[in-house]
Amino acid sequence: YTTLRVRGTDPSRINITSNGVPQSDAESSQLFWVNMADFASNLQSMQIQRGVGTSTNGTGAFGATINMLTENIGTKPYVGLDLSAGSYYSHKQTVRFSSGLLNEHWGIQGRLSNIGSKGYLDRAFTKLNSYFLQAGYFGDNTVVKFITWNNQEQTYHAWNYTSKYEQSMYGRSYNSCGYMGKDDNGNMMFFDNQTDNYHQQNYQLVWNQRLNSALNFNVTGHYTRGDGYYEQYKRNKPLINWGLSTNPDEKGNVIEQKKLGNDFYGAIASLNYSADKLSATFGGGWNKYDGDHFGKVVGKPNYEYYRNNAKKTDYNVYGKASYEFLEGMSAFVDLQYRHVNYTMQDPTDSYGSNADGKYIIDDDFNFFNPKFGINYDFLPGQRLYISYAIA
C-alpha cells in the first residue's frame, strides 16, 4: 500500500536512513512512504544494500539497508517548475529554488510539492502536500547544514482484498472500505471520511568536519514529530469493543478514530579514516521514541476508549574496517553492539485489557552483530565476494 520490498523481504526487515538518521518507524520498523511525498526530488543518491547490511543506525536490517543522501546546494541560483499529469486525475506540481552560493560559503534551497490522484479503485483518492528546505555554511573543511521537510497526507482506505466474486459483481475497481450497507433503493452506501490522515515534520542539523586528507567526522542531531489518525466506519459490531456497553451481545454502528502522536529524536556520529589500503569508521548513535496511541468515537468528543504510551530507547556503537591486502582483494570486519529498551503502558485498543494501567512491556535487549567478508575484483566489472553476518 505504501511500502517498499527488496527481493520480497517484509518492509519491517529493511533498515532505512536519510543522511544516516533512522527513518523507519521505531515501533513498527517500517517506513510508510506516503509520509515522504516527493522526497526523491531532493535526493543526491539512494544506496540499496541487499541482505544483512553493514552497521548503521536505527532498526535491525535482515533483508536490506537503504540509505538516502539529500542533495547538496548547487553553486548557481535557479528556480524551477515541474508539472505532470496522468490517468485517474493523477497530478504532481513541484516548485524548486536555490540561492546558489552566497559570499562563496552560504546557501539556501527549497521545494514545494503537491501530489494527488482519484485512484484506480473507487474513492481511493490521494492528497499529498510537502516541502523541503535546507540552509547551510560550506567551507573548505567545514560544512554545517540545517535540513527540514514536512508532509501532510490524506488518503482514502483501499487496503481491503477484492475477491473475484466482488469484481464480477461490482467491477474491477470495487473498493469495500467504508461500506455502510444499502439504502431503501438497494444502492450501496459508503462512508465518505474513511481516510488516513497524517502530518510529519523532520529536522536535521548536520556537521561535517574534515580534519586532514585522511580523517573526517560527522555529527547529526535530529527530531521528528508525527501526528495523525485514521477514521473508519464499523457496521453492526459489538459495542463492548468501545466500552459503549457492558452487554457483549449488543451491537451497533460506530465511527472510530485511532490517533497517534509521537516524538523521535537523537544524535548520530562517526569518525572516518581513509588512506592507502585501509579505510575505517567508528561510530554510533542514541535515539528515543515517545508515542501516544489513543482512540475516540465520533459523536462523543470527550470520550476515549483507550490510551497508551510507548517509549523506545535505542543506542549503538560500531567499528568497521576494510583493508586491501592484495591488489583487487580486500577483507572487511564490522562489529556492532546495540541496546534497546522498550516500554508500553496499557490499556490497548482491545477495550478492558489490563485497564489498571500497568506497564505490559518493559524489556531490555542487547545485541552483538559481527560481520566479516572478503571481496575480490578479478576483472573489470566482475567481482566475487563472500561474507558472514549476524543481524
Regions found by a protein language model. Name each.
Residues 85-116, 121-158, 203-213:
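Transmembrane beta-barrel wall of Gram-negative outer-membrane proteins
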Residues 83-89, 101, 114-118, 139-141, ...:
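Transmembrane beta-strands of outer-membrane beta-barrel pores
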Residues 37-80:
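A beta-strand signature from Gram-negative outer-membrane beta-barrel systems
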Residues 14, 75-79, 91-93, 102-108, ...:
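Outer-envelope beta-barrel architecture signal
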Residues 197-352, 364, 370, 375-381, ...:
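Face-selective signature of the C-terminal outer-membrane beta-barrel domain
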Residues 3-5, 22-50, 69, 166:
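Short acidic/polar hinge/loop motifs at secondary-structure boundaries
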Residues 28-29, 48-49, 77-80, 114-118, ...:
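Extracytoplasmic loops and strand-loop junctions of Gram-negative outer membrane beta-barrel proteins
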Residues 143-204, 231-252:
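Acidic/polar loop-and-plug regions of large Gram-negative outer-membrane beta-barrel proteins
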